Amino acid sequence: MTPLLFGSAEAPLYGVHHPPQATPQNSGVVVCYPFGQEYMRAHRACRQLSLLLAKKGFHVLRFDYTGTGNSSGDAEDTTITQWKANVGQAIYELKELSDVSSVSLIGLRLGAVFASLASLDRSDVDRLVVWDPVVSGEDYIAALQREIAAERPSTYGPPSGNRELPDGALHYNGFVMPGSLRRSVAGLRLDAQVPTSVGRILQLVSHEDATFARLRDAWRTHPAFRYQFTPAPHDWNFVDNFGGILLPQPAIQGIVAWMAQETP
């Protein structure tokens, strides 16, 4: 496991490369994180997923988008277009590190959207995994707004700071989504376009949801699409006083099993 900086010298991205721990596959994996508190909750799960895939012989790269985590940049200046481009930069870096001929993209929540968008313009993405994906950006934003509006003052500690600002920025669970980013996220629709250039697709969901079903119905026209319902913990945006993480083993194991099975 090797931390690294990649991309341009002016705006480097932070990533972690997991080299294969078994006979190397001729395919690498880029893991695309979710955003905000979901990133914090999912960090350990994505790390474990990367370690398990490395044990199956995959080169794996997980990374932080511009303006998030340990990457350079300011969240105020980030855009969906930039984060989609970051996925492309991660693909390039992984291919340089490993000399693999193709890549697989695994995205969780909003990361699933960025992975899918990045795959549309490429011919080297062999597999795409969308895990509990955000299907409608508008619904995603509305859910955050409901959580903010429903919050009650804390009895046991200081106020959380969750609020919606006049410019549209959302402050939720310690993270800020600037108004410009919120507006671009609201326009996202994962079911609007089938990623036809991808060789194989797995939609893995840990709970039943009408938007998941809508995506399944839109993407099932792909000849190598698989929908998998694997019950697992899925409250990605929950936060408690102990900084709880989410480690949904059934979902992680399901993705690893599919990746291993689908390897040529």
What feature does the model see in each segment?
Residues 122-261:
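The alpha/beta-hydrolase serine catalytic core
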Residues 5, 15-16, 54, 61-63, ...:
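Terminal, non-globular segments
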Residues 19-64:
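Short, surface-exposed "cap/lid" segments of acyl-processing enzymes
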Residues 68-102:
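Catalytic nucleophile-loop/oxyanion-hole region of alpha/beta-hydrolase
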Residues 117-121:
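Active-site signature of alpha/beta-hydrolase-fold catalytic machinery across serine-
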Residues 106-115, 132:
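Gly/Ala-rich beta-loop-alpha elbow adjacent to hydrolase catalytic centers
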Residues 36, 65-70, 135:
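Alpha/beta-hydrolase active-site loop signature
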Residues 1-27:
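N-terminal cap/lid segment of alpha/beta-hydrolase-fold proteins
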